[in-house]
Amino acid sequence: MRDSFLKSSPVSQVTSSSSIPLDEAVIQRLIDLAEDAGRAILSFYEQDAEVREKSDASPLTAADLASHHEIMQGLKALMPSVPVLSEESAPINAVERLAWSTFWLVDPLDGTKEFLQRNGEFTVNIALIDHHMPSLGIVHVPAQKRTYVGRVGDGAFLLGPDRRKTSIRISEEAQDPLRVLGSRSHPTPDLDAYLLDQGAFVMEAVGSSLKFCRVAEGSADLYPRFGPTSEWDTAAGQAVLEAAGVTSLTFRAVRFGTISIPVC
């Protein structure tokens, strides 16, 4: 995905809504589920983790799997008829998956490298995809006890450690110098070349989907991403961004569940 998430003025054309009933009680249950998964992750946080390498060379730990099982069980109990695609799911036949009109898209532990480094910048991502677009996104940051929630067309909010609910919105104007976020684990030469054309900027390295949320809450201006990334890495963050009013000269809202391999 080669999209730059730069906030400027609120976007008006994003009106996606879910065909699944999402009242406040359902959204609260989803928040609780993300936070339960976060607690499962934190139960491993201070331990020396055994790390396995997946086929794509990314790391896998017991914390990834504990969060995965927590979320899978919770979503199946909440909405048994809605399929779930998780990063840690067993492979699902592409023909079957591409026929889904509505499904959950989950990254049970985004930022496993950040988890292993114990820097607190890892997240739990839960998104509802409806007709290829995210209509709801929940990004929970377990180590910070912060949960970002975005319902496209209905706004975004943050639940902080004090459980206070605060509406979030992108800043109306980019700052000078531009506040830019980059990946802590995946720096690229393309990013360096891109930033040469952006004028004055201050770069901050941040892990996981927390970067999306930083732009959504207005504490950063730009998150450029170059190279491939998986759909479960971006779906929940995209929903939070859109709900918070993101727009950009280069922002392209990614459509999900349209290709046989979930990479965008």
What do the PLM-derived regions correspond to, one by one?
Residues 1-32, 193-197, 212-264:
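Oxyanion/phosphate-interacting regions
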Residues 41, 64, 75, 112, ...:
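Residue-level signal for inorganic ion chemistry
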Residues 2-109, 193-196:
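N-terminal subdomain of lithium-sensitive/metallo-dependent phosphomonoesterases centered on the IMPase/IPPase/PAP
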Residues 126-213, 222:
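Acidic beta-strand-loop-alpha-helix segment within the catalytic core
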Residues 100-144:
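Glycine-rich active-site/cofactor-binding loop and its immediate structural neighborhood
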Residues 86-88, 207, 252:
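Short loop/edge segments at beta-strand edges and connector loops
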